[in-house]
Amino acid sequence: MPTDISEKGLETILVEYLRDKQGYEQGVSDDYKKQYGVDTERVKRFILSTQKEKAVSTGCFANDNEERKFFTRLSAELTKRGVSDVLRKGFRYISELFDMYYPLPSELNPTAKKYYEKNIFCVTRQLFYSANNTDSIDVMLSLNGLPIMTMELKNHYTGQTIENAIKQYQNDRNPKEDTSALLLMKKRCAVHFAVDDDLIMMCTELCGKSSWFLPFNKGVNGGAGNPANPTGIRTSYLWEDILGKHSLSDILENYAQVVKKKKRVKDKKTGKKKDVEKELVIWPRYHQLDAVRQMLDATRKGGVGQKFLIQHSAGSGKSNSITWLAYQLVGLLDGTTPLLDSVIVVTDRINLDSQIRDNINAFKRLKNIVEWADSSATLKDALKDGKKIIITIVHKFQYILETIGTDLKDKRFGIIIDEAHSSQNGSLSAKMNMGLSGNVATDGKDLEDKLNAIIEGRKMVKNANYYAFTATPKAKTLEMFGTPHTKSDGEIEHTPFHEYTMKQAIEEGFIMDVLKNYTTYASFYKIVKTVEDDPEFDKKQAQKKLRAWVERQPETIHQKAAIIVNHFHTMVINKGKMGGEARAMVVTSGILRAIDFYYEINRLLEERKSPYKAIVAFSGTKEYNGKQVTEADINGFPSKDIEDNMEEDPYRILVVANKFQTGYDQPLLHSMYVDKMLTDVMAVQTLSRLNRCHPKKIDTFVLDFANDEETIKAAFQKYYKTTILSRESDPNKLNDYISAIEEANIYTDDEVGTLNKKYWNGVSRQELDPIVNLAVDRFKALDENKQISCKSSIKGFLRTYPFIAAVTSYKSLEWEKLNTYFMLLVHKLPKLKDEDFTSGLIEAIDLDQMQVTKLGDAKIALENTDAEIEPIPMGKGKGGKSEPEMTKLSDILEQFNGINWQNIELAKQQLDELPNRIKGDEAFVNAAKNSNKATAQQQFNSSMLMVVANMLNENTEFCRQYLDNPEFMNFINDRVFQNVYQQVNSAK
């Protein structure tokens, strides 16, 4: 007979593997009783084999009537609490608590092993689940008679794929339309899988066409999908690995859960806010399960003293991963004692405390193991009381650890760092290490012993493990927490321990691709001189000052705000984006600009009789129009209500200044208007506010007034796939700093040694100042250039040393002594004031004309490559003060206007025509199609010169600016090249 390549054949492979290799029983559909939604035969068999005395005591199986009461009660508990909770905690019937599952045993408990083996894992195919129709589910898995999973299988060989399985669930498996289908009801079955021979998707709540299926795939080359399986079907890991008894038990015990979340919403009738509770059914995604299991396994095998960097993209579910990791770390054993005494979670998200606490309370019967520590007192109490999981905000952690003392060195810790790039600088990390290791200076030691203890304390401590989570690892983060590998050239690179890439998250639909619809605008200005004479100013300083001045002019704010309001209404609201629920964010460069935009946007909204309003968000207090104001003063409601109010009308536009650009997860955000220079991590984090998925969200939009496409692309490219540190930092950079400082001759070795001895012996402050002041007086005698070089090198040393000391094995008493000396000295050195060579500039000018012009729409495409980044640069510091280039105001304005102003219509006409003309250049088109991007760019530059020269008679002024002004040439080239290069290649 030929091979069975039908859907039934795939079903047979799965079922027979679970039965023959994984030890499952194979059930039949009649075992499942539709009126109770359970396999009554196996429930009864499990209880009688493990808790017969309870069955006798309650008489639950004495006769048909008692049996009916028992199963009715069990069914009600499943509906109320969910199958995962009933399995973990059992359920009460009359006077007894019935266990419905026996957990995985430890190796030291043979009795628990005996009971675990009595669990009944069962696989049933073609299960008829409804009393109202004859529909059947391809596969159901049950545990002790309780359904935990269903599967619909499809097969490419018969012309059906996973999409058909999903549609089957959405169209034919709706519990709201068939109340007899208890198997499909929320919580009663933990998860529903759609499976074909290539892909797996999962859903935890069936609700008709709104059923949301998420990928449960391994990923391929940093993207979506599953790798080829040399010994079988791509998706066989589901039944060969995930659904093994041990693996499935682990998921049910430590991952699957029902979480209750409260949310404040406005009552539409009363207008008042009220709390609404919603239940979420959680099942781990593949990468979460894989990452947590790998970290737990490495911790079991390697004990403490390890580092793990987890590069998981936005949308990866880091909060749940951190919760599952923390909860299971405290349960690891070293023989019969806990492997870790406490797990400390360091985060900058206040809401993570309640999230972890709520999630952990859903497991087993453990209570009160999570403590929120916002001071040294609460941390000490938490440790003293044996709190297993301690959560603290990153900016409190330094203060807390400085006050801990030395009594922690005999304890073992797990430190989970949420968004490691923002919470780990060298100094903070060093203090964390000192606090946990107990390596702080104490009385009774000589100076060398004390300094050696501090050096050791700066290093990654041996009595702790670090688990660092971030989507955007910087060089320092990779070097501090990444896994080292020696390359063929002898250099040591650092890589993440585990990754779930931005590329995979986008391809799997967990986050939106925020670069798909990216529109850039440019501001053109013409400034005129308002004084008769022609004063001179520093050319470089003047250009910066002019740019800042024109950007804050009322006309500039007005034009940009008008573009924002018009776009939001016509292209977002009127087009019904997100079913009419879409929100927007305006990113500004500072608080004053944010307030200006807030008032102008609200004025324009009111002018067009819009029903919507804006909210402004910034931290602290700011003087505005002669009055000190806060965001609450301007908005008219407390700051704590900003996030909730953004979900309710009339508020639709959030105007921010360095706030809500990180950690703000609002799926209703659809559009972003950027008026701030963004680079590297900040660009990724800011634009990623748009990437949260929502059932009604099919696209996003960015309108950028301040950045070009290449800058944004370069920022995202670093974190699109795996980020790798190419080599480790060179400790000799510290010697470079020292050499630069020593050239100034402001201290002696004896002074450094004497100050250290006095400082670490705790002498009076009065004994320190005379030593430090010797260097201060010598510093004041230096010329200005040497002062700049010396002070910047001191700051560079102080910034670099704690990091180098933490990540390298080198010890240096000299470096530690200098660190102490410079730490005191730098605060007493006089502040160096840069002389203002632009004084009077603003009073001598006026804004004559300005216009904000659209440059083009783009889909920014990222390269399918990993990114190598270099260690943080550690140079010698500034070489001194540069001489001002004094230039006449008329010349400064000519250059500024040349870049920022031309006849708008003619300029726009040229920008519109240039792409078509350059696409007619055969040399460029060949280079674009057949060479790499760099070669195509070189040919483009040559071709553009010829094209512009041929346009001389059409627009002399434009051509003159292009040929004579390199900055203007680059401005035009950058924009035109990106446009035509993409067009030429998309037409291939």
Feature locations, PLM:
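Inter-Walker segment of RecA-like/P-loop motor cores
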Residues: 361-402
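Catalytic cores and motor modules of nucleic-acid processing enzymes
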Residues: 44-61, 65-69, 269-274, 306, ...
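Conserved C-terminal RecA-like helicase domain
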Residues: 548-656
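ATP-dependent helicase/translocase motor core
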Residues: 2-342, 351, 355-366, 395, ...
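Post-DEXD/H (motif II) to motif III coupling segment of the RecA-like Helicase ATP-binding lobe
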Residues: 425-514
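Interdomain helical connector at the RecA1-RecA2 junction of SF1/SF2 helicase-like NTPases
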Residues: 229-232, 476-581, 598
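Conserved segment of the helicase C-terminal RecA-like domain
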Residues: 689-718
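Conserved RecA-like ASCE ATPase "motif II neighborhood" in helicase/translocase motors
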Residues: 387-419, 423-434, 442-456, 635-643, ...
